[in-house]
Amino acid sequence: MSGASVKVAVRVRPFNSRETSKESKCIIQMQGNSTSIINPKNPKEAPKSFSFDYSYWSHTSPEDPCFASQNRVYNDIGKEMLLHAFEGYNVCIFAYGQTGAGKSYTMMGKQEESQAGIIPQLCEELFEKINDNCNEEMSYSVEVSYMEIYCERVRDLLNPKNKGNLRVREHPLLGPYVEDLSKLAVTSYTDIADLMDAGNKARTVAATNMNETSSRSHAVFTIVFTQKKHDNETNLSTEKVSKISLVDLAGSERADSTGAKGTRLKEGANINKSLTTLGKVISALAEVDNCTSKSKKKKKTDFIPYRDSVLTWLLRENLGGNSRTAMVAALSPADINYDETLSTLRYADRAKQIKCNAVINEDPNAKLVRELKEEVTRLKDLLRAQGLGDIIDIDPLIDDYSGSGSKYLKDFQNNKHRYLLASENQRPGHFSTASMGSLTSSPSSCSLSSQVGLTSVTSIQERIMSTPGGEEAIERLKESEKIIAELNETWEEKLRKTEAIRMEREALLAEMGVAIREDGGTLGVFSPKKTPHLVNLNEDPLMSECLLYYIKDGITRVGQADAERRQDIVLSGAHIKEEHCIFRSERSNSGEVIVTLEPCERSETYVNGKRVSQPVQLRSGNRIIMGKNHVFRFNHPEQARAEREKTPSAETPSEPVDWTFAQRELLEKQGIDMKQEMEKRLQEMEILYKKEKEEADLLLEQQRLDYESKLQALQKQVETRSLAAETTEEEEEEEEVPWTQHEFELAQWAFRKWKSHQFTSLRDLLWGNAVYLKEANAISVELKKKVQFQFVLLTDTLYSPLPPELLPTEMEKTHEDRPFPRTVVAVEVQDLKNGATHYWSLEKLKQRLDLMREMYDRAGEMASSAQDESETTVTGSDPFYDRFHWFKLVGSSPIFHGCVNERLADRTPSPTFSTADSDITELADEQQDEMEDFDDEAFVDDAGSDAGTEEGSDLFSDGHDPFYDRSPWFILVGRAFVYLSNLLYPVPLIHRVAIVSEKGEVRGFLRVAVQAIAADEEAPDYGSGIRQSGTAKISFDNEYFNQSDFSSVAMTRSGLSLEELRIVEGQGQSSEVITPPEEISRINDLDLKSSTLLDGKMVMEGFSEEIGNHLKLGSAFTFRVTVLQASGILPEYADIFCQFNFLHRHDEAFSTEPLKNNGRGSPLAFYHVQNIAVEITESFVDYIKTKPIVFEVFGHYQQHPLHLQGQELNSPPQPCRRFFPPPMPLSKPVPATKLNTMSKTSLGQSMSKYDLLVWFEISELEPTGEYIPAVVDHTAGLPCQGTFLLHQGIQRRITVTIIHEKGSELHWKDVRELVVGRIRNKPEVDEAAVDAILSLNIISAKYLKSSHNSSRTFYRFEAVWDSSLHNSLLLNRVTPYGEKIYMTLSAYLELDHCIQPAVITKDVCMVFYSRDAKISPPRSLRSLFGSGYSKSPDSNRVTGIYELSLCKMSDTGSPGMQRRRRKILDTSVAYVRGEENLAGWRPRGDSLILEHQWELEKLELLHEVEKTRHFLLLRERLGDSIPKSLSDSLSPSLSSGTLSTSTSISSQISTTTFESAITPSESSGYDSGDIESLVDREKELATKCLQLLTHTFNREFSQVHGSVSDCKLSDISPIGRDPSESSFSSATLTPSSTCPSLVDSRSNSLDQKTPEANSRASSPCPEFEQFQIVPAVETPYLARAGKNEFLNLVPDIEEIRPSSVVSKKGYLHFKEPLYSNWAKHFVVVRRPYVFIYNSDKDPVERGIINLSTAQVEYSEDQQAMVKTPNTFAVCTKHRGVLLQALNDKDMNDWLYAFNPLLAGTIRSKLSRRCPSQSKY
């Protein structure tokens, strides 16, 4: 029967009086063995269910069929436990629950026989079974002990001699036991009942004297049940000993629920310590049992804390040991006790998982005899089964065996103590009392007490005391003597000892004044019939009426035992005087006994709640309180009997006269009303709080006024000084020398460029109008309009020409006032109901918003009519909707940026912008009759009119129905552009051009043929599908072109100056691109010369040699444009048609017939032929040389919402999809507590930048006294992330290490403060939450020593973190499964020469485990990282990447600065009624500008591709004989700037402009006539690159011994250009050959580099220190700046979140200049950073390289120089390092990951080599 689980039963009691008075509700439900509890605070929450062995419903009355009585509880639990006891097992029953839950009632019950508890019934049945035994061989003995555990002290309740606290000892064989605990022999149930009563009396007396209650102490009643059996065959006696432990645990109440204070609170803490330890033991045992099946090996964590409390120490065998254990959990059904009841249920649920390994406690000899008998029986059965039963009785072997067996058993009996000791040594902790009893039969075991004399014992003690450790030895000797003396006692001696103790106990009680029965005993329940007496009352019902004191005739004195005169009733405790009071019992004349109470002087005596100082006559039932703790009820039997006879109907008290009644009566009579006292105290606290709050508010208001006055004074000073400075500047400007023409040109160029930037203005528009957008969306959602509004940026290009209504009024001017394509902020209106998209201007949005508000106000009145109309129409009198498009634009091709955009916009505006009178609408009107079979209507008209009527279409213009715009049925699919330069020669060309949408998406392809023809030539026969029109005559007027400024210079890239590039803002404004005055001069000169090309006949003179005879001025010329096919158009568009026109024409375009688009992949065959006749003019020649024809493709939208009956979209608008993933939220710094509030200083120019690599560690205190870094879980696999796995309740420290490159500007001075706060269980920060901010104590801050050659700085500081000071439950408890705790940490660090501290902020993720839990990384992590990093503290850290910028303070007096700092309120945060319905939708912000910039760059690239394709097609047709001038005008994309290594399109365009301006003769492309000059140029560039490679390479890497031809760098490289902007030739060989760390000649350009270009990447960590940095030869800002200027630096630290996209990862070999060996490291490229690890198993970032500031170099000469293949170099400002890949392919992949443009350039160069020289 070993391995059985603990039996667990729960029992719910009825409501008590307190719960009934509070009208409590029952929250416990039971069904079978399942128990459920309902949370009264959250009734909707599902009930928590628990399953136990027994669930007893005792909440109702016994009449309930489900009611569980005392007998049922005993029959289920008590009988089973008693049966186990007779079998020889140890048995334990303990009750648990809060105070008043019914534990004692279940265990002890009441005096009524039907309500007896488990203990009385078990004891009674025990003796019934003993008495019913008829086996003469069996004999029984029962011994009991009764002890109390209070505040970790043990008291003997049965022996009055043991007045002190007993010691708990542990014996190697017996285990834990209580020294000197009385073990009394009993022979009947009456003896046990008397001993229980005696123990309760002793417990009551002690508790009353010490102001205790039984509910605050643990009581353990132990019965040692011994069964002896005499075996007649062997003449041996065997024993089975069972120990029955009956435990009544203390209440598990919480301090706040019982109102405990002071001493009571301390006592409760000690009691809860025992219960807490018991809970730990139960949890540990349950966990061990659960893990047994998984792993049989005992772990170090399988420690059971038995010794943490006396209770668990003594009950060790009963909890998971050699015992059969049952637990009864008592529950309160009331909702006010929900927390305690739930805790009890969880306690019991854990207990049922414990398994006990119980064994039968019998002697080894008895076990051996039994096993031998079983073996003999088995052998006899076997012989009989084999047919040899007749020889069993006569076989001599068997007789000999039997004889030898008996002999052996006798020998074992004589020496059984040896076998016993050997057996117990093999099985420690399972020693039985019966086995110890067998020790007495051995002579050797008795020698210590009987055969050894006193002298020998004394000599032994002296010898032991003289040796080291003698005291311990003598203690163990005495302990053994006591045990042996106890075991040697016979049964008769034990009975005599029990009787003597009983006499002493009763004498002691009698001496104390406790009443004596007629038989002389004080025990048992009795009530005197005549004598007046006092009965004690106690808070514990079991202690009430337990003590009875007689009031004898005459005087009965009450006082302390040490009084001068003997006291009849002895009391002790606080406030009891030596002579406290006197009871006088006198008989009156009538024979009635009158008892009078006379209090002594200064004694506290109360009668019925009133303090008495004079004699008082007592009546039966009076309550008497002596001192503070002794409460009695006076009983006068005769007086009570007489009163009942006089008044039979006397009223009985409405409630029992108990201890609670007496205490409440005392408070009432003393005038103490607890409720009033609490209310009075609460009012006092409220008054005090209001007073202090008023004082604080007054002080705060006074301080605010003081600060405001100071700020106003300072502001006046600043304004006065700024005004004076501006006046001085103006005066100085007037006195300056007048500008020269060149200076005016430079100023004009700069002003035009500055004027073209719009970033700030666009942002102001987005911020300022966000509130209108939000309000429009909110009204749309509330009115269920299914219309969404969002910001969009539109640029006036040929892809998306803007109609006049979207242009602001100030932009509608001539081209001279607006020379650049402008970007406007518009509103994208998505009509989800009609499937249309419109674009409104901001003014139109505001106008419509007024109408929306009016409609919203009239929504109730229009509800009925609007509902009908909205179901039958798709448009109507609704400001939300514009007319939707039936044909949609698919795509378009790129175009130039001149004013033609505006002309094209006026001629053929995009359908999405078109008005009701647009050309596209007219086209739809013309084709309406032909498409009547397709649809009945050509337009969707307003709701209030008939379809297609003029009235309905004019509603908006007339103002009757201003809510709808008419939209065409055809939607623009896209645009394509075809150039006509082949007409110059003439040669026919067939173009396949991309159809590109306004967003830059390719929507299909269009095949167009352009050729020159004779005037009378007929169109070819294309088949039945041909659609042919006649010859159209078009004029190209020179005057018109001049007025319209359609010049070739304005439309060609070669003639554009820098400011005429398309710029939103920041484009072309890169800090790395600096245009020196010489370059500007050249550009302006070229621009001025080009601007005169149209004057006179310069155009024709310049191109006269290249134009054929067919293009003579004034002659007629005819050419043909054939629209062949369209392919790749999405099937959602039907009825596709195409129209085309010239850029300058405003009349009707040339259009094809619509074709059905079945979407099967077959091209749409238009085969539309259009002959065009023109008169040749200079404008026409210029047009065909530089300008295209625009083709617009339109389509019909198949999935029309009328066919789908509208879209039922009731969800709020969602945020639009972005082009890049949104950045992770970054927490704001935690405010400092010791520093003054830092103002957000306006930052000026950044002087230098540093990349910081920061390590965060949390260390915990280990048992060794050292702080070890806590384990970090890196399973997420992303950089700069990790979860700290911490222990609960352990001291911690936070360590932060900052790593960066050395720099003279950056020096950490001190750590001003480290603050932590924002404790939460989710990553997002709740700004509204009020959280305590904790400032940590900095214990160390210092620089760490690194290697001698290290160019990195390591700064580390450490702080003490006590998480309990946060007073946060999240930090104090064990984190539930699946939950994580987040905390924000901010470090304020002081830097030299900075006016304010720098702030490093990090969000830390943590999980808390129990204090004793063994934490290790997850299994998958260990298998992934291996043993090297899963166990090393080196991996227990979380990294962070930061960018530190040291900036100047901004110039407050500059008007430009004041303009840029103008305060534009971000209205997106303003509340709008109904915005809560938008479900997270937000207006677009600054990111929209960047996305639009990307769109423009994408369109620019598409445009360049189309132009290049046309140029290559024409060159192929002409056989590479295309003139140079035409290549200049048509193909700037093939100039040297195309292969530049610049990273943005703007810098590419700038480079192209510079190259064409400086060396216009060198950008001629691949003309066969210039091969020789090209070869010479290549030779010159190769010489330059060779000189750069050999002369400027770092001296640390190699020493160059070869000689190179002497050529000056100034003669080759462009002067004053930024080194990062290299020419075509240099980019081909060494794109970044001017890297500062690898070029010695970089000093020529240092002063021209911006500070942003000087920022660099941080170096790796100390773990691979060989990653050194080579300092650059550069003058730092510290040396260049003045002292006062340098002190004005402001640090700005921004956390960088690495990208989750991995470009490449793998191993690379690193070599530093100062090291001779190569080091292998694992590298991961997450642009723009390169992360360096020690290996692929390393979870911690050891170093980073910022690719945005680093330069990558590669050349074959470099590899030959270092004599190592597959190498390339990476250099930053302070470092240069060589990297080696595995092979050529791997190196090429790494180069592509590091610098894609460089890799592409190298591939392009190598592909042009001959195959014999190709390496790839």
Curated annotation (Swiss-Prot):
<dbReference type="InterPro" id="IPR001849">
    <property type="entry name" value="PH_domain"/>
</dbReference>
<feature type="region of interest" description="Disordered">
    <location>
        <begin position="1550"/>
        <end position="1570"/>
    </location>
</feature>
<feature type="modified residue" description="Phosphoserine">
    <location>
        <position position="1057"/>
    </location>
</feature>
<feature type="compositionally biased region" description="Polar residues">
    <location>
        <begin position="1554"/>
        <end position="1566"/>
    </location>
</feature>
<feature type="modified residue" description="Phosphothreonine">
    <location>
        <position position="647"/>
    </location>
</feature>
<keyword id="KW-0225">Disease variant</keyword>
<feature type="modified residue" description="Phosphoserine">
    <location>
        <position position="1454"/>
    </location>
</feature>
<feature type="coiled-coil region">
    <location>
        <begin position="470"/>
        <end position="502"/>
    </location>
</feature>
<dbReference type="GO" id="GO:0098794">
    <property type="term" value="C:postsynapse"/>
</dbReference>
<dbReference type="GO" id="GO:0030672">
    <property type="term" value="C:synaptic vesicle membrane"/>
</dbReference>
<dbReference type="InterPro" id="IPR022140">
    <property type="entry name" value="Kinesin-like_KIF1-typ"/>
</dbReference>
<feature type="modified residue" description="Phosphothreonine">
    <location>
        <position position="1075"/>
    </location>
</feature>
<feature type="domain" description="Kinesin motor">
    <location>
        <begin position="5"/>
        <end position="354"/>
    </location>
</feature>
<protein>
    <recommendedName>
        <fullName>Kinesin-like protein KIF1B</fullName>
        <ecNumber>5.6.1.3</ecNumber>
    </recommendedName>
</protein>
<dbReference type="InterPro" id="IPR019821">
    <property type="entry name" value="Kinesin_motor_CS"/>
</dbReference>
<dbReference type="GO" id="GO:0005874">
    <property type="term" value="C:microtubule"/>
</dbReference>
<keyword id="KW-0505">Motor protein</keyword>
<keyword id="KW-0622">Neuropathy</keyword>
<dbReference type="Pfam" id="PF16183">
    <property type="entry name" value="Kinesin_assoc"/>
</dbReference>
<feature type="region of interest" description="Disordered">
    <location>
        <begin position="1617"/>
        <end position="1660"/>
    </location>
</feature>
<keyword id="KW-0206">Cytoskeleton</keyword>
<keyword id="KW-0597">Phosphoprotein</keyword>
<dbReference type="Pfam" id="PF00498">
    <property type="entry name" value="FHA"/>
</dbReference>
<keyword id="KW-0067">ATP-binding</keyword>
<feature type="modified residue" description="Phosphoserine">
    <location>
        <position position="1603"/>
    </location>
</feature>
<feature type="modified residue" description="Phosphoserine">
    <location>
        <position position="1573"/>
    </location>
</feature>
<dbReference type="GO" id="GO:0030424">
    <property type="term" value="C:axon"/>
</dbReference>
<feature type="modified residue" description="N-acetylserine">
    <location>
        <position position="2"/>
    </location>
</feature>
<feature type="compositionally biased region" description="Low complexity">
    <location>
        <begin position="432"/>
        <end position="450"/>
    </location>
</feature>
<dbReference type="Pfam" id="PF12423">
    <property type="entry name" value="KIF1B"/>
</dbReference>
<dbReference type="Pfam" id="PF12473">
    <property type="entry name" value="DUF3694"/>
</dbReference>
<feature type="coiled-coil region">
    <location>
        <begin position="668"/>
        <end position="737"/>
    </location>
</feature>
<dbReference type="GO" id="GO:0047497">
    <property type="term" value="P:mitochondrion transport along microtubule"/>
</dbReference>
<feature type="region of interest" description="Disordered">
    <location>
        <begin position="431"/>
        <end position="450"/>
    </location>
</feature>
<feature type="compositionally biased region" description="Low complexity">
    <location>
        <begin position="1621"/>
        <end position="1634"/>
    </location>
</feature>
<feature type="domain" description="FHA">
    <location>
        <begin position="556"/>
        <end position="612"/>
    </location>
</feature>
<dbReference type="GO" id="GO:0005524">
    <property type="term" value="F:ATP binding"/>
</dbReference>
<dbReference type="GO" id="GO:0005737">
    <property type="term" value="C:cytoplasm"/>
</dbReference>
<feature type="coiled-coil region">
    <location>
        <begin position="365"/>
        <end position="386"/>
    </location>
</feature>
<comment type="similarity">
    <text>Belongs to the TRAFAC class myosin-kinesin ATPase superfamily. Kinesin family. Unc-104 subfamily.</text>
</comment>
<dbReference type="GO" id="GO:0016887">
    <property type="term" value="F:ATP hydrolysis activity"/>
</dbReference>
<keyword id="KW-0963">Cytoplasm</keyword>
